[in-house]
């Protein structure tokens, strides 16, 4: 067993156990699922409804002026402006985006030095902004005149009064954590603790205080002990009430002059106006609500045709609740983990959840309702889940793999979508497996058995299984039987579609192909590929940056050079000119500060292998505010009792500020406690030591950002705990043998159900067939005309059976023996003797009363009454070897083989005539010597049997029914009417009367045996081992119309076979002979529509005209010997060979229509219907092909040794054999309709051959026995 098979088996078993759990305890599981849904949806209480997110409108900065109010707008004037863009905004928001880093980085710097010095410069920037004034011709403009003046905070925000501004300008910066006091900041030993002390203990869904003051999301701030970029980002937010272009321009120019950003390419060209809608937007919900209504209606009208569902409304409602809960759980979990579900630009997410959820609902419903109706509900649920387990997990793994690949592209848009998608998939899988499966089990449980019997659906319109409480079924279940009698492999994948309505066909098509999920996966891959290449943070820009860095002219190849003071202009971005505070002490040349060692800052101490914090500006920095929560601005203004509902604010272009600090400033800003044992020591330490995660100070908890990686780890841990909890619940609640055989006598193991690949287990029944016993060896030849059945075993015995009653009508013994009676009574008597023989009877031999008292064998079976005309010779067998006289010259007795009567007698042997002669004289019979061969007839007419040599069976003297001769073994057999045509290995052709058991005529012997026969109307064709063909014509010599018909037409279209009277004289004339039809032995022979087709080991087929033996075509197309041939009245010819190929030919033109390789090995049998070709091979595989195109529909894997056991009952009904059973298949769709077991006696025997009769009966060859099975009536109605 391969790894994939073991994994598939384990997944199937896990889903099977889960199905048992859900169906056994539905109420607790539904309550548990409901609690999980409510818990996951709790964060949604703080979110607006979908569609109420902010709306944007962009205008250019140049010549901007506030729009007029609504009354000033001209009526009917066409405009592209939205309706809400009227009047002045609530406020103008100006963000000053600061990026700061310490460069160059020394290895003796601490982790806290990354953000302490950059944050300290925020106080200086705030002072510069507050002190900025504009002097022009109109007067002096200051910040206090233009900013938004705020008053007190709301009464419930007392904790924030020292952190947010009151009674002044609304100006926010990280310095607000320390009341904009630099001394407080410098004296704070735990900066991170101060920043996070006002954070809620649980994950917050709306804007937090840190986001408000920093102005950027927490993960972009860089204020963390574990950051590796060594860059700090924050904003200083100014809120203006009036727009003054000159003041804003002068502020921008001053800040960019003081803190230039040489590589900044941000464009200050547009204003973004953001309008906030009402909290309740019902109009925006109409498309989504309509979608769910359509979903409900579609599932309801689809399940109306599934009669195995009790409540269609309930099932549809459960499906809608499942999909809606999946969406709400996804959004709630995303919100809980800090992912803001704005759905801006991605509002397709709810509809993707609908599509995926609908498809999974259809898959589960289809799988469960296709299970056998006679099983318990929990077993049906378990089996339905198990059958779809592999496809569900395979699709789940594929989707998660695509999401994982997309996440590691590091493109923000793709990462956000992937995080939403993974949460949605996990939520949907959780609800499908727990909620919908449990609801489905409750609904099916309500379907009572009486209602099922009244309204059986197309999937279960077959008779139910035998009552499970009967001991016979229990014994049969314990018997050894293969786990899967049949495995149907569909090419391409198909599903159960037996007489289904069109709406159910659509449903099952979606469930089978997973079309929606595959299209979504393909679209996701294409979308990810496009974004990876086109996104600003994607592959194209990354490659361009790499090429630039590796270029000899790139900035990375030029080392920084020390420049003496005073050589650069004031606008140069050197940190010494832009960062030093104006009151910083000027040190003389070659001197250092008091606390700094002379070696510190030297070139040897710089960590060159660490990532250089290059301050870069990209297009994503222009609108970093978009990454904030959509509740960021409404939350800020709501603190001052200002609402933004139905109003808008204007966001001004960002002002970039770059700060580069040298290591000396980082050391000067360090707190005294930073150098203690709490942080890495300031002495020389290995490079990157603090990056491995320094410990926080004792007793002080180091607050870290709740990053996505932490959330992922938390989610993984939660999932593991949940799985372990469910496993423990299963172990506690379910016993080890739950749902298996030990639970009851009629409960069946799932592996014993003949399920196909899609989990459908059709009803199985058990009947007692008519067993035809009469052969001691395996049956080799079998023929029937619909009413009579002829069988021949390897011993040479021929039995004629009545196909209606199963009675043995005639028994023809081996050659070389005489027959005294051939009536029906003797046949029944012989049948009884053979049954006693096969049953191992211990009765003693019956001796003739007038025989002398001779020594008897101590035990042994009685001689069969079949040879009653012979004296009993068993008394002559002497087993007392010790009392026998020793012969001086030992003789070798001749072997007692009767099959070869014409062997040479030249070698001396022991003569038994002295013993046998006395017994024959006492019986009154003449001594019988070995008869010689009858001389061949001089002409081509077959010699007639000497019927006048013996009287009727009623006469006293025994008659010779036929002259014994060395005919050889029987190689071929055909039956028509009451005539049996036998072809023997000696080349002799014989015609027998099937009713009387007499030989009508025979041909002369030739050196080549007869390998195949065709008996059609009055023509007989014999194919011989040497490749020749003999054409015979059958004639009678009584009246002009000697034929009478027996019975009525059967299931076939042809009338019943003619019956020849026993008083008729039957003769056969050899009309034509084709001496060299093939170069090698003929192995296949068929005739229809006046054409005869032969197949040989010379790899060719030949088509002859039946009336004059004229060869019409020689067909070449196989690379191996021909093994089977089929031809019908429509002149369609099919052939199979040892090369495993099947060829379709046109008999009218001799052209090959199609050629396919069907099997791995010989093609053993071949038959056709009006629409398909059915083949079987030595690989025990039955394949069904399209007759017109040669396309393979599907294949059925048979049991070992049962590959050739198949028969076609009608154009859409196929019967196949298995280990002690026969199965019925629908040819149109490949569905297993029913499996019928033939009792305990046949369980261990494979069905080697199946022959379909015209009276709705099937004959199965189980070695030395035949089983006569009548087709179930429901299949006849289906036909």
Swiss-Prot record:
Modified residues (Phosphoserine): 822, 838, 851, 907, 937
Positions of the UniProt region annotated as Loop-1: 46-284
Glycosylation sites recorded in the entry for this protein: 263, 590, 641
GO molecular function, one term: sterol binding
Modification comment: Ubiquitinated at Lys-454 and Lys-466. RNF145 triggers ubiquitination of SCAP, likely inhibiting SCAP-SREBP complex transport to the Golgi apparatus and the subsequent processing/maturation of SREBF2/SREBP2.
Gene Ontology, cellular component aspect: endoplasmic reticulum; endoplasmic reticulum membrane; ER to Golgi transport vesicle membrane; Golgi apparatus; Golgi membrane; membrane; SREBP-SCAP complex
GO-annotated biological processes: cholesterol metabolic process; COPII-coated vesicle cargo loading; immune response; negative regulation of cholesterol biosynthetic process; positive regulation of cholesterol biosynthetic process; regulation of cholesterol biosynthetic process; regulation of fatty acid biosynthetic process; response to hypoxia
Listed Gene3D superfamilies: YVTN repeat-like/Quinoprotein amine dehydrogenase
Start-end of Polar residues biased regions: 877-891
Membrane topology recorded in Swiss-Prot or TrEMBL: Multi-pass membrane protein
Membrane side Cytoplasmic: residue ranges: 1-18, 301-312, 366-401, 445-518, 731-1279
Region Interaction with SREBF2, residue ranges: 731-1279
Chain location of the short sequence motif ER export signal per the record: 447-452
Keyword rRNA-binding: no
Domain SSD residues, every copy: 284-442
Up-regulation conditions: By androgen-bound AR and glucocorticoid-bound NR3C1 in a prostate cancer cell line (LNCaP).
Modified residues (Omega-N-methylarginine): 1051
Lumenal topological intervals: 40-279, 334-344, 423, 540-709
Location of the protein in the cell: Endoplasmic reticulum membrane; Golgi apparatus membrane; Cytoplasmic vesicle, COPII-coated vesicle membrane
Function: Escort protein required for cholesterol as well as lipid homeostasis. Regulates export of the SCAP-SREBP complex from the endoplasmic reticulum to the Golgi upon low cholesterol, thereby regulating the processing of sterol regulatory element-binding proteins (SREBPs) SREBF1/SREBP1 and SREBF2/SREBP2. At high sterol concentrations, formation of a ternary complex with INSIG (INSIG1 or INSIG2) leads to mask the ER export signal in SCAP, promoting retention of the complex in the endoplasmic reticulum.
Subunit note: Membrane region forms a homotetramer. Component of the SCAP-SREBP complex (composed of SCAP and SREBF1/SREBP1 or SREBF2/SREBP2); interacts with SREBF1/SREBP1 or SREBF2/SREBP2 through its C-terminal cytoplasmic domain. Forms a ternary complex with INSIG1 or INSIG2 through its transmembrane domains at high sterol concentrations. Interacts with PAQR3; the interaction anchors the SCAP-SREBP complex to the Golgi apparatus in low cholesterol conditions. Interacts with the SEC23-SEC24 complex in a SAR1-GTP-dependent manner through an ER export signal in its third cytoplasmic loop.
Protein family membership: Belongs to the WD repeat SCAP family.
Name of protein: Sterol regulatory element-binding protein cleavage-activating protein
Native species: Homo sapiens
Gene field: SCAP
């Amino acid at each position: 067993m391969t790894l994939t098979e073991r994994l598939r088996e384990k997944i199937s078993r896990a889903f099977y156990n889960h199905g048992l759990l859900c169906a056994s305890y539905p109420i607790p599981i539904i309550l548990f699922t409901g609690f999980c849904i409510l818990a996951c949806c709790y964060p949604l209480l703080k979110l607006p409804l979908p569609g109420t997110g902010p709306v944007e409108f962009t205008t250019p900065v140049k010549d901007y002026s506030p729009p007029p109010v609504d009354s000033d707008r001209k009526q009917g004037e066409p405009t592209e402006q939205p309706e809400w863009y009227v009047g002045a905004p609530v406020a103008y928001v100006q963000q000053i985006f600061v990026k700061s880093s310490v460069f160059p980085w020394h290895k003796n710097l601490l982790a806290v030095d990354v953000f302490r010095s950059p944050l300290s410069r925020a106080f200086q920037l705030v002072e510069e902004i507050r002190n900025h004034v504009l002097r022009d011709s109109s007067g002096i403009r200051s910040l206090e005149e233009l900013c938004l003046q705020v008053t007190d905070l709301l009464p419930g925000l007392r904790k924030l009064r020292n952190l947010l501004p009151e009674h002044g300008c609304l100006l926010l910066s990280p310095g607000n954590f320390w009341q904009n006091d630099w001394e407080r900041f410098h004296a704070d030993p735990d900066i991170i603790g101060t920043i996070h002390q006002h954070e809620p203990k649980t994950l917050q869904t709306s804007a937090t205080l840190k986001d408000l003051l920093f102005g950027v999301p927490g993960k972009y701030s860089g204020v963390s002990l574990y950051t590796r970029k060594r860059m700090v980002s924050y904003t200083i937010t100014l809120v203006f009430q009036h727009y003054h272009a000159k003041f804003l321009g002068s502020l921008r120019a001053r800040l960019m002059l003081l803190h230039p950003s040489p590589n900044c390419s941000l464009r200050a060209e547009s204003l973004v106006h953001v309008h906030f809608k009402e909290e309740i937007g019902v109009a925006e919900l109409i498309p989504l609500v309509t979608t769910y209504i359509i979903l409900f209606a579609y599932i309801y009208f689809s399940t109306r045709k599934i009669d195995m569902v009790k409540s269609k409304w309930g099932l549809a409602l459960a499906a809608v609740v499942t999909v809606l809960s999946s969406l709400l759980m996804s959004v709630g979990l995303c919100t809980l983990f800090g992912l803001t579900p704005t759905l801006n630009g991605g509002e397709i997410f709810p509809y993707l959840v609908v599509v995926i959820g609908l498809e999974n609902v259809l898959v589960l419903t289809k799988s469960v309702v296709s299970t056998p109706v006679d099983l318990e509900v929990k077993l049906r649920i378990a089996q339905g889940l198990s059958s779809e387990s592999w496809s569900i997990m395979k699709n789940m793994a594929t989707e998660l793999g695509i999401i994982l690949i997309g996440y590691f592209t590091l493109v923000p848009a793709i990462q956000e979508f992937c995080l939403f998608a993974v949460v949605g998939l996990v939520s949907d899988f959780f609800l499908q497996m727990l909620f919908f499966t449990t609801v489905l089990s409750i609904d099916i449980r309500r379907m009572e058995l009486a209602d099922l019997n009244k309204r059986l659906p197309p999937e279960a319109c077959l008779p139910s299984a035998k009552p499970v409480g009967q001991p016979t079924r229990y014994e049969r279940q314990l018997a050894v039987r293969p786990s899967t009698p049949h495995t149907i492999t569909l090419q391409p994948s198909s599903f159960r579609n037996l007489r289904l309505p069109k709406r159910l066909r659509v449903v099952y098509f979606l469930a089978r192909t997973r079309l929606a999920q595959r299209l979504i996966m393909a679209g996701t891959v294409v979308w990810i590929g496009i974004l990876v290449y086109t996104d600003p943070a994607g592959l194209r820009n990354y490659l361009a940056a790499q090429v630039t860095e590796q270029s000899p002219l790139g900035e990375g190849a030029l080392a920084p050079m020390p420049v003496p003071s005073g050589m650069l202009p004031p606008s140069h971005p050197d940190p010494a000119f832009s960062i030093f505070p104006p009151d910083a002490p000027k040190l003389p040349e070659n001197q250092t500060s008091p606390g700094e060692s002379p070696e510190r800052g030297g070139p040897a101490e710089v960590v060159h292998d660490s990532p250089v914090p290059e301050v870069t500006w990209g297009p994503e920095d222009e609108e970093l505010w978009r990454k904030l929560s959509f509740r960021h601005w409404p939350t800020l203004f709501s603190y001052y009792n200002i609402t933004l509902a139905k109003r808008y604010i204007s966001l001004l272009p960002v002002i970039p500020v770059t700060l580069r600090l040298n290591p000396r400033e980082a050391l000067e800003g360090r707190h005294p406690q930073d150098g203690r044992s709490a942080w890495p020591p300031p002495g020389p330490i290995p490079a990157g030591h603090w990056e491995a995660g320094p410990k926080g100070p004792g007793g002080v908890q180091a607050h870290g950002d709740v990053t996505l990686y932490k959330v992922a780890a938390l989610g993984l841990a939660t999932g593991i705990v949940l799985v372990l909890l469910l496993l423990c619940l299963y172990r506690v609640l379910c016993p080890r043998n739950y749902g298996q055989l030990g639970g009851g006598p009629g409960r069946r193991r799932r592996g014993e159900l003949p399920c196909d690949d899609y989990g459908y287990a059709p009803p199985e029944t058990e009947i007692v067939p008519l067993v035809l016993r009469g052969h001691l060896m395996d049956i080799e030849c079998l023929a029937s005309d619909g009413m009579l059945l002829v069988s021949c075993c390897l011993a040479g015995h021929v039995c004629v059976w009545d196909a209606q009653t199963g009675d043995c009508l005639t028994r023809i013994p081996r050659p070389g023996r005489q027959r005294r009676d051939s009536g029906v009574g003797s046949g029944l008597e012989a049948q009884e003797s053979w049954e006693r023989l096969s049953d191992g009877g211990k009765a003693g031999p019956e001796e003739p009363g007038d025989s002398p008292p001779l020594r008897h064998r101590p035990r042994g079976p009685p001689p069969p009454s079949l040879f009653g005309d012979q004296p009993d010779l068993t008394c002559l067998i002497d087993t007392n070897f010790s009392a026998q006289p020793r012969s001086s010259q030992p003789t070798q007795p001749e072997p007692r083989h009767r099959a070869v009567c014409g062997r040479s007698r030249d070698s001396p042997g022991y003569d038994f005539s002295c013993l046998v002669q006395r017994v024959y004289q006492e019986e009154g019979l003449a001594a019988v010597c070995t008869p010689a061969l009858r001389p061949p007839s001089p002409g081509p007419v077959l010699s007639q049997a000497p019927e006048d040599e013996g009287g009727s069976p009623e006469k006293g003297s025994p008659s010779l029914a036929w002259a014994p001769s060395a005919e050889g073994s029987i190689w071929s057999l055909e039956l028509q009417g009451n005539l049996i045509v036998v072809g023997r290995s000696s080349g002799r052709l014989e015609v027998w009367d099937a009713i009387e058991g007499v030989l009508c005529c025979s041909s002369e012997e030739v050196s080549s045996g007869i390998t195949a026969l065709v008996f059609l109307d009055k023509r007989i064709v014999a194919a011989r081992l040497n490749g020749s063909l003999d054409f015979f014509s059958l004639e009678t010599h009584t009246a002009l119309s000697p034929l009478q018909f027996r019975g009525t037409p059967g299931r076939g279209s042809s009338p019943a076979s003619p019956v020849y009277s026993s008083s008729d004289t039957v003769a056969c004339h050899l009309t034509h002979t084709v001496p060299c039809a093939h170069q090698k032995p003929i192995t296949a022979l068929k005739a229809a529509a006046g054409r005869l087709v032969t197949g040989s080991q010379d790899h060719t087929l030949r088509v002859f005209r039946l009336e004059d033996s004229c060869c019409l075509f020689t067909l070449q197309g196989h690379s191996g010997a021909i093994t089977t041939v089929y031809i019908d009245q429509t002149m369609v010819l099919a052939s199979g060979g040892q090369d495993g190929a099947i060829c379709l030919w046109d008999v009218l033109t001799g052209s090959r229509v199609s050629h396919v390789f069907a099997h791995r090995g010989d093609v053993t049998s071949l038959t056709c219907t009006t629409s398909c070709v059915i083949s079987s091979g030595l690989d025990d595989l039955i394949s069904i092909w399209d007759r017109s195109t040669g396309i393979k529909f599907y294949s059925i894997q048979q049991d070992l040794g049962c590959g050739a056991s198949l028969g076609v009952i009608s154009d859409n009904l196929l019967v196949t054999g298995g280990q002690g059973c026969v199965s019925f298949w629908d040819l149109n769709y490949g569905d297993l309709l029913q499996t019928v077991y033939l009792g305990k006696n046949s369980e261990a025997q494979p069905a080697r051959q199946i022959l379909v009769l015209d009276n709705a009966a099937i004959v199965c060859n189980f070695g030395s026995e035949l089983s006569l099975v009548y087709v179930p009536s429901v299949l006849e109605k289906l036909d």
